[in-house]
């Protein structure tokens, strides 16, 4: 099966005789041990790793992990409200496109053929989009209380992220990202300058 999300980050002692398969087993075993130590029920492993991996790809600053975990929980719970159970996470769309970083364009955000497109598919994507740290996993297991439904990283270099509970607040915060992107086209477009 797919080992995405199951390969625990860290340092491993490997013998000369160890095969790649041995190393993968060691990495997966460390993840399972970590989940057991955190008392995660086995049936929740996949969802916890998926959520934690999204958190890490969405924000590059661990001080925001808990708030992003809360946004994910609030969005998943709100199937009839403002967000209709859609996570709407750029990181999942980018993963489905085989990219890391940047911001998906409107065509990519509307593409229902991308199974990881959480702008069009409700709930969690099919699986983890990276191998999360223990800190991100802990954020999923114990998110802070809050009514946030939205967040936007307004500076892709520093990771500064703003959270909001309404679409109106989010629109105001998104304008700050737009201003940043006008000044930093290459960063916002995944290393490519837009022509024209």
Residue ranges with predicted function:
Residues 1-196:
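Bacterial extracytoplasmic/cell-wall-associated proteins, especially those involved in peptidoglycan
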């Amino acid at each position: 099966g797919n080992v995405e999300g199951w390969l625990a980050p860290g340092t491993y002692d490997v013998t000369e005789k160890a095969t790649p398969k041995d190393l993968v087993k060691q990495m997966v075993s460390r993840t399972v041990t970590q989940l057991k130590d955190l008392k995660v029920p086995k049936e929740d492993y996949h969802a916890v790793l998926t959520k934690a991996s999204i958190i890490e790809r969405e924000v590059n600053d661990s001080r925001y992990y808990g708030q992003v975990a809360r946004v994910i929980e609030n969005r998943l719970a709100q199937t009839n409200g403002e967000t209709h159970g859609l996570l709407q996470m750029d990181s999942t769309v980018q993963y489905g496109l085989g990219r890391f970083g940047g911001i998906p364009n409107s065509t990519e955000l509307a593409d229902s053929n991308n199974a990881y497109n959480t702008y069009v598919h409700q709930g969690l994507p099919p699986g983890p989009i990276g191998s999360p740290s223990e800190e991100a996993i802990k954020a999923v297991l114990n998110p802070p209380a809050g009514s946030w439904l939205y967040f936007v990283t307004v500076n892709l270099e520093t990771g500064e992220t703003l959270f909001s509970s309404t679409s109106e607040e989010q629109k105001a915060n998104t304008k700050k990202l737009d201003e940043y992107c006008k000044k930093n086209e290459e960063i916002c477009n995944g290393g490519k300058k837009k022509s024209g």
